[in-house]
């Protein structure tokens, strides 16, 4: 078992056209569904929809910190619907890091495999999935409003993996190598690892 196995199981249990995998302790605002459906209905051939988010630390919402700022910058090109179908732009965004918050995502099941996540990935299974789906024709819809809250705490799986020796870095490097030559991947790793501090308390 593992995160990917659990997420794939949850995904398979839904027999609806759209699926959101709600993570434990995350919070979805009352307008989350409305915003997701609005984005998906306005899109041309949607693959998935995702939103901006806020963090929940010690029970309180946090709307601004270094990690959230970086992720907003990564997603800046997609604040207009005209860019949602651009394979080039979303691959360029993903080539610098994973700006998409996994629990914010609503999946269009007809466009994705029955098991969307690759078993074996520990920390970057979402980034790895977005990289694969970024090659598909269709739209990555983006809601720029923070309509859900992602809880950051010591017991989260992400915090556990980052805390392990070399637990996350090999996966991060492997992801960068999907986009960049070795020297550039190593350079980006230097900056990306600093952002991991925001996932620890």
Predicted segment positions?
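Short aromatic/hydrophobic "clamp" motif used to bind/position activated sugar donors
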Residues: 19
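Conserved nucleotide-sugar donor-binding catalytic segment
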Residues: 75-169
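Non-catalytic, C-terminal membrane-associated alpha-helical segments of glycosyltransferases
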Residues: 161-174, 186-201
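Glycine-rich, basic loop-to-helix element that forms the pyrophosphate-binding segment
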Residues: 1-14
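The conserved acidic donor/metal-binding loop of glycosyltransferases
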Residues: 23-27, 52
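Conserved donor NDP-sugar-binding/catalytic core segment of glycosyltransferases
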Residues: 31-71
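Short, high-confidence coil segments that cap the C-terminus of an alpha-helix
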Residues: 16, 43-46, 138
């Amino acid at each position: 078992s593992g995160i990917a196995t659990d997420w794939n199981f949850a995904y398979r249990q839904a027999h609806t056209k759209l699926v959101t995998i709600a993570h434990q302790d995350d919070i979805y605002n009352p307008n989350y569904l409305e915003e997701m459906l609005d984005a998906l209905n306005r899109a041309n051939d949607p693959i998935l929809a995702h939103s901006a988010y806020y963090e929940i630390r010690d029970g309180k919402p946090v709307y601004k910190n270094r990690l959230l700022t970086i992720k907003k910058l990564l997603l800046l090109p997609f604040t207009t619907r005209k860019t949602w179908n651009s394979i080039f732009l979303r691959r360029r965004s993903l080539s610098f890091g994973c700006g998409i918050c996994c629990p914010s995502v609503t999946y269009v099941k007809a466009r994705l495999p029955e098991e969307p996540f690759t078993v074996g990935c520990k920390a970057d299974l979402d980034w790895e999935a977005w990289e694969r789906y970024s090659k598909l024709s269709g739209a990555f819809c983006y809601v720029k409003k923070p309509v859900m809250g992602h809880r950051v705490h010591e017991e989260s799986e992400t915090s556990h993996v980052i805390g392990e020796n070399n637990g996350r870095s090999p996966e991060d490097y492997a992801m960068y190598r999907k986009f960049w030559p070795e020297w550039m991947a190593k350079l980006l790793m230097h900056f990306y690892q600093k952002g991991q501090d925001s996932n620890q308390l």
